[in-house]
UniProtKB/Swiss-Prot annotation:
Protein name in UniProt: Thymidylate kinase
Keyword terms of this UniProt record: ATP-binding, Kinase, Nucleotide biosynthesis, Nucleotide-binding, Transferase
NCBIfam families: DTMP_kinase
Pfam families (alphabetical): Thymidylate_kin
GO MF terms held by the record: ATP binding; dTMP kinase activity
Gene Ontology cellular component terms for the protein in this record: cytosol
Catalytic activity, reaction form: dTMP + ATP = dTDP + ADP
Family the entry assigns: Belongs to the thymidylate kinase family.
Positions contributing to ATP binding: 9-16
InterPro entries referenced in this protein's UniProt entry, alphabetically: P-loop_NTPase, Thymidylate_kin-like_dom, Thymidylate_kinase
Function according to Swiss-Prot or TrEMBL: Phosphorylation of dTMP to form dTDP in both de novo and salvage pathways of dTTP synthesis.
Length: 216
């Protein structure tokens, strides 16, 4: 079954944890699943990821940041995502084009039509069939992300955690605006609650989109 699902959300919304659970559930039903992420997902894009997320690069110009994301995505799509879909796999991607719109467009203030154009250039017709937007208050998510990095889970990828609460609120509101624009594709999932509760909500939405048995 060739199907493309992206998971989006603010920092600390639990995407990385939940994407693994979703993959396990789908694989238990016999589906071939590929988990990947952005920025990154292949060697060239992973090198760009180091530039984009390292906290020492706080001075990175917003336009340079945007172009680096586009470059990483173009390689990622060509090398990983499109081949996996061609092989009939379900692709689960931790962030994709909507993240660029939310972060570089809504939060950084770059021209949204320009960002959309670059997304289209980088991704072509490789668009998610379903996007799961894990939503929670931006201050709670940021606190969770900063705590995670303080414990050493990602000390060299904390550049966005250094941004202000106002920045992260713009990211969240940007995501929600995108969901209002594309309600058929982007499904808002309440990311508050226990891991199992959020996992259940994600499965209900995913199983409905894939016409799979619901429930956990």
């Amino acid at each position: 079954m060739s199907f493309f699902i992206s998971l989006e959300g603010i920092e600390g919304s639990g995407k990385t944890t939940q994407i693994k659970r979703l993959a396990d559930r789908l694989e238990s039903l016999g589906h071939a699943v590929l988990i990947t992420r952005e920025p990154g997902g292949c060697p060239i894009a992973d090198q760009i990821r180091q530039i984009l997320l390292h906290p020492d690069n706080g001075h990175l110009d917003p336009k340079a940041e945007l172009l680096l994301y586009a470059a990483a995505r173009a390689q990622h799509v060509a090398e990983v995502i499109r081949p996996a879909l061609d092989q009939g796999k379900i692709v689960l991607c931790d962030r994709y084009c909507d993240a660029t719109l939310a972060y570089q467009g809504y939060a950084r203030g770059l021209d949204l039509p320009m960002v959309k154009q670059l997304n289209e250039l980088a991704a072509g017709n490789c668009r998610p069939h379903l996007t799961l937007l894990l939503d929670m208050p931006h201050d709670r998510g940021l606190l969770r992300a900063r705590s995670r990095n303080a414990l050493g889970a990602g000390p060299e990828e904390g550049r966005f955690e250094q941004e202000s609460l106002a920045f992260h609120n713009k990211v969240r509101q940007g995501y929600l605006d995108l969901a209002r624009q594309e309600p058929q594709r982007i499904k808002v999932v309440d990311a508050n609650g226990t891991l199992d509760e959020v996992c259940h909500r994600i499965w209900l939405t995913t199983s409905n989109a894939l016409n799979l048995p619901g429930g956990m």
